[in-house]
A protein has these predicted regions:
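Beta-propeller blade signature
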Residues: 184-193, 308-326, 367-380
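A short helix->beta-strand "capping" segment at the edge of beta-propeller domains
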Residues: 33-61
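Beta-strand-rich domains and repeat architectures in extracellular enzymes and scaffolds
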Residues: 52-85, 289-296, 301
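Structural signature of eukaryotic scaffold interfaces centered on beta-propeller domains
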Residues: 62-70, 114-119, 160-171, 215-222, ...
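Conserved blade-ending motifs and adjacent loop-strand segments that build the rim/top face
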Residues: 252-265, 326-347
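C-terminal motif of bacterial Sec signal peptides marking the signal peptidase cleavage site
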Residues: 22-24
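Loop/turn-rich, solvent-exposed surfaces of beta-rich toroidal or solenoidal domains
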Residues: 274-321
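Blade-loop segments of beta-propeller domains
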Residues: 94-123, 129, 149-155, 333-340
Length: 381
């Protein structure tokens, strides 16, 4: 099943057309000064042959790397076309039987899942903008909890808006999630034992400012800390459960642009999202001891004749931060290789990209392999 598998130990795989720059930064209340060295980056490329039994996708908007019950490293990927979790076994480079979800009946999930966490080999928690579900690995709904209408959750993964996640704490049987409470942003806590919610913490810094489609910040969790990064600017903040804030406010060095204002016209809003950068969520990589972020640059296409081509002709940038949010790496990954619509996912020690972009991959073969470029990071500390 393995058609190609290679691994090169180097700071960057130049065959992918990349350039890397170690960048110092200025920080806010608790950040350090300048980074001393870039982390070690190890790339490997995996091609997984398509299955004759199950319909797979060239890339998936929502994925998670897990270890299955046999101890194999596996990608659990949400397939919106088949309403299932596809399973890509990276240990043996093959697709395994998917977890098929139901739309109706006692195990029915009526909405579209926008977040999930496979926290154990046999258990998944998932959210469809209405309910939180506890699922097993055959797609049965073991339990479910409906979130209250207020405060308003803003959990989503959208390449034009923002990415904001939930955070499941198995030891407490609780889920943290971001919500809007009147003119403030808060983290709510759902107690799975009682189904009750309460306010966990306030999140400072949100003003309701709008830049095109973008209003809310990207928001992720690093254990009990909250990491925020607005999609229209380079700044990053970490808020502890006690309210202490660490900020990184230095601009990028490889791409200086930030999003400007936009007229409230539908066509202008669409082009604003393509002609401006989009700063993605900042994710803690516990095994690497680093934070990482993907940034989409403005489209390279001149003119406004082809919005679809413009959306795929965008440079990808990788930013890496140390524990104190000092920038330790900025990397230009180039354009035309990955999908800007969520075609990547973070792992405990790095990031994976699906090889999927219509500008360079013109194949119409439904049996084409799924290609994953895997980057493993290691802190220089």
């Amino acid at each position: 099943m393995i058609t190609n598998h290679h691994c090169n130990r180097l700071l960057l795989n130049l065959s992918l057309g990349m350039a890397v720059a170690a960048a110092g930064c200025s920080t806010g209340s608790r950040g350090g000064s300048e980074a001393d060295s870039s982390p070690l980056a190890v790339w490997d490329t995996i091609e997984v042959a398509s299955s004759q039994e199950w319909f797979s996708l060239p890339s998936y908007m929502t994925s998670q790397q897990i270890v299955n019950s046999e101890g194999d490293t596996t990608v659990l990927a949400l397939n919106y076309r088949t309403n299932s979790f596809d399973r890509i076994n990276l240990t043996h480079n093959r697709f395994a039987a998917p977890i098929v979800l139901n739309r109706e009946g006692p195990d029915g999930i009526t909405g579209e899942i926008i977040w999930f966490d496979a926290f154990a080999p046999d258990s998944i928690v998932a959210y469809d903008e209405v309910k939180v579900y506890l699922l097993d690995t055959v797609g049965r709904v073991i339990d479910s909890w409906q979130l209250p209408g207020e405060p308003i959750p803003f959990v989503t993964r959208n390449a034009q808006l923002h990415t904001a996640e939930m955070h499941f704490i198995p030891s407490e049987r609780s889920i943290l999630y971001p919500a809007r409470k009147e003119e403030q942003m808060v983290i709510e806590r759902l107690d799975l034992s009682t189904g009750e919610t309460d306010e966990y913490m306030m999140v400072p810094g949100w003003t309701g400012e709008r830049r095109g489609f973008m209003v809310y910040p990207n928001l992720t969790f690093a254990e009990t800390d909250v990491i925020t990064a607005f999609p229209y600017q380079a700044a990053v903040s970490r808020i502890s459960a006690g309210g202490d804030v660490t900020s990184q406010t230095a601009p990028m060095k490889l791409m200086m642009a930030e999003c400007g204002e936009c007229a409230p016209d539908p066509n202008e809003l669409m082009w604003h999202s393509l002609e401006n950068p989009h700063f993605g969520e900042v994710v803690w990589l516990p095994e690497a001891g680093l934070y990482a972020q993907i940034v989409l640059g403005p489209t390279n296409l001149e003119g406004r004749e082809d919005p679809q081509k413009a959306s795929f002709d965008r440079n990808f940038y990788l930013r890496v931060f140390d524990r104190n949010l000092n920038t330790v790496m900025e990397t230009d990954l180039g354009a035309g290789r990955f999908s800007p619509y969520g075609g990547w996912f973070f792992t405990p020690d790095g990031i994976c990209f699906y090889g999927d972009n219509p500008l360079t991959d013109t194949s119409t073969d439904e049996n084409a392999p799924t290609i994953i470029y895997r980057l493993t990071l290691q802190s220089a500390d």
